[in-house]
Structures are given as structure tokens and as C-alpha cells.
């Protein structure tokens, strides 16, 4: 049976598959349109499985927030061109919305199949790398942020506010948004110095001490220098101790205290997440 170019184009328009693959699928099922769509899915999943071993170092971060939850999702792919593809972006936005609304932090079988179908259509190794879903309490204010046109960085920050009547306060909401921007810019690893593993602190202290051994300085002087270096380093990776993004004369902790005093309610960061491509 001869397959016309019009039939191939119709199948291509519906499925997004390549012209050659559409022709092969139609030939294989004798021109039956519905069977050809099924055949393409089978072909696509097989080819997607073959591509799954290839490096996927590019990608895009997606985020969604509603009244109950906030989420971040990283979908990886092979090229930044695909990360800008409209089908890729639409799929990612839809998937993170589904995950947040369901409260699930893992994919179901249907979603896994949809990932494979997308990979088959785009012809790259595409997979979900990370998912973060966090519940939002009634006294918590959340802001999320995606950086740049390619959304290679995504963050959310969650503030606990003692007086829920202040949740709509402009200065509070501005603070929350600024803190989201801050997390995107400085990528803190911990909320506070107290959250940092004691073994890590000990390793850093030993490293700084070793660096100073050949300095010829006295033990007391070395101890003081090491203490200063350690304090500086820990402050650089702990969010509350970092210089505030819009006023580095204040730490993040001091900026929160400033706004807290101005609106007469206690504010504290209870959660944040930073997610990036690569």
C-alpha cells in the first residue's frame, strides 16, 4: 500500500514525530492512522531507552506554588536548545503543577511514560533529576523564583509569621521576594551555622591550620587566624549569616529582624531550597 505525503504530514502534526518515523509507522500498519500512532509510541519508547545512557547535562528548573504546597522540579536534557523547546517547557510546567497539586514527590507510571514519549518526540535523553515538594502552613509565606529566560536556577523560601494578620504586609512580602532572589544569587548550603555538620567544621579547621603551619607565626596567632577564617567560611555558606543581597552591611538575620520590628511580629525562615542545572 502506498502512503501519501499528506498522510505522513497528518501523523507528524498530531504526534510531533519525525517525517521518516511517521512514514515507517504507517508502512508497518498498512496506513491505519490510529495503529500508526500506537506504533510510533512503541518505536519512541524503544529509542528513548537507547538514548537514556547519554549525558544529559543541560535542563530547566520548573516551579509552582498554590495555597497548600510549593514545588521545584529539575528536568535534564542533552542540549540547551531542547531546554528552550516549547514542548519541553509546556510539559515541565504541567508536570510540576500536577506534582504540587497531588502532593507527590515522585512520578507515577503515567508520568514516567509521558517523559519517555517526550524524549522520543524530541530525540534526546530527557529525565527528571530532582523533585522538591513542601507543604505550606497557614502562618507561612512562600515566594518562589526562577532565574533567567532559561530557568537554570530555581528557588523557594518559606517564612513563618507569628501574626497571620500581617501576611499581606507589603514590606513582609518584599522581604520574602528579596530573600528568594538572595538564595538564587548566593546558593547557601545551610540555614544557620548551627545546622552545619560538626565533622565538616572540624575538617575545615584542620585544613586552615595546615595552611598556616609554614607561616612561622606563633601557635596563639595561628589559632586566632584560623578561627577568623573558619568563621568567615561558615558565614559564607549559612544563609542567615550571609550579607543581605540588597544591603551587605546587614546580614540576612539582621535584615529579617529589622522588618520584624517594623511590622511588630516575629519572622523566621523555616525552609528554603536551591536547585540548579548542572
From Swiss-Prot:
GO MF annotation: an example: translation elongation factor activity
A cellular-component GO term for this protein: cytoplasm
Top-level taxon of the source organism: Bacteria
Keyword Protein biosynthesis on entry: yes
Region Involved in Mg(2+) ion dislocation from EF-Tu, annotated ranges: 79-82
Compartments where found: Cytoplasm
Pfam families with a match to the protein in the record: EF_TS (PF00889)
Entry keywords, A to Z: Cytoplasm, Elongation factor, Protein biosynthesis
SUPFAM superfamilies the UniProt entry points to: Elongation factor Ts (EF-Ts), dimerisation domain, UBA-like
PROSITE patterns assigned to the protein according to its UniProt record, in alphabetical order: EF_TS_1
rRNA-binding found in the keyword field: no
Gene3D superfamilies assigned to the protein according to its UniProt record, in alphabetical order: 1.10.286.20, DNA helicase RuvA subunit, C-terminal domain, Elongation factor Ts, dimerisation domain
PANTHER family: ELONGATION FACTOR TS, ELONGATION FACTOR TS, MITOCHONDRIAL
Function per UniProt: Associates with the EF-Tu.GDP complex and induces the exchange of GDP to GTP. It remains bound to the aminoacyl-tRNA.EF-Tu.GTP complex up to the GTP hydrolysis stage on the ribosome.
Family affiliation: Belongs to the EF-Ts family.
Protein name: Elongation factor Ts
Record lineage: Bacteria, Pseudomonadati, Spirochaetota, Spirochaetia, Spirochaetales
